[in-house]
From Swiss-Prot:
GO cellular component, one term: cytoplasm
Broad class of the protein's primary localization: cytoplasm
Region (Disordered), start-end ranges: 1-20
Name of protein: Protein-export protein SecB
Pfam family, one: SecB
Single GO term (MF): unfolded protein binding
NCBIfam families hit by this protein: PRK05751.1-3, secB
Keyword Protein transport recorded: yes
C-alpha cells in the first residue's frame, strides 16, 4: 500500500508541472473602526408597533502591503430609523491581511474583492449583531452579501464612467 504522506511540498501537481500551488491565507483579522450611536436613547429604546427602516451600505477596499500580502477592508454601515428619528447608526471597518500567491494576475481583483470579503463577512456580521444588541436593540443580523454581484456592478460602473469624455 503506497502513501503520499512523504511527498515534498511543491512537488508535481498532477499535470507534470512543479511549483507552488495557488494559495490564499488569512494572516490576520482586526477591527479597524467600530462606532455605535444611539442619539435618541433612552427614548429610542421603547417598543414600536412596526419595524424600523434599516439602510445598509457595504464597501470593500484592498491595498497591497507587499508583493504577496494585501490588506482588505470591509466597511458596513447600518442606520435604523423610525419616522424621522434615528434609532441607531453603526459603522464597522473590519480588516483582514491576506497572503495570496500562485494565482494568475487576472484572478487577483476577483480574489481581493469577492473571496477576501466573503471570508471576513461572517465575523463582521457577528460584530454588528453584538454592537446593536449591546446598544439595547435586537441584534441586527445582516443578510448574506453577494460580493460577486457587487464586484461586477463596480466593474460595469467603472467602464461606464471611462466612456464619459471629459471636455
Amino acid at each position: 500500500m503506497a502513501s503520499n504522506d512523504d511527498a515534498p511540498v511543491g512537488a508535481a501537481n498532477g499535470n507534470g508541472n512543479t511549483g507552488a500551488q495557488p494559495s490564499l491565507n488569512v494572516l490576520a483579522q482586526y477591527v479597524k473602526d467600530l462606532s455605535f450611536e444611539s442619539p435618541g436613547a433612552p427614548n429610542s429604546l421603547r417598543g414600536r408597533d412596526k419595524a424600523p427602516g434599516i439602510a445598509i451600505n457595504v464597501n470593500v477596499n484592498a491595498n497591497p502591503l507587499s508583493d504577496k500580502q494585501f490588506d482588505v477592508n470591509l466597511t458596513l454601515n447600518a442606520k435604523a430609523s423610525f419616522d424621522q428619528e434615528v434609532l441607531f447608526n453603526v459603522e464597522l471597518v473590519y480588516g483582514g491581511v491576506f497572503a495570496i500567491s500562485g494565482f494568475p494576475q487576472e484572478h487577483m481583483l476577483p480574489i481581493l474583492f469577492i473571496e477576501c470579503p466573503r471570508l471576513l463577512f461572517p465575523f463582521a456580521r457577528q460584530i454588528i449583531a453584538e454592537a446593536t444588541r449591546n446598544g439595547g436593540f435586537p441584534p441586527l443580523m445582516l443578510d448574506p452579501i453577494d460580493f460577486a454581484q457587487m464586484f461586477q456592478q463596480k466593474i460595469a460602473e467603472d467602464q461606464a464612467a471611462s466612456k464619459v469624455k471629459v471636455s
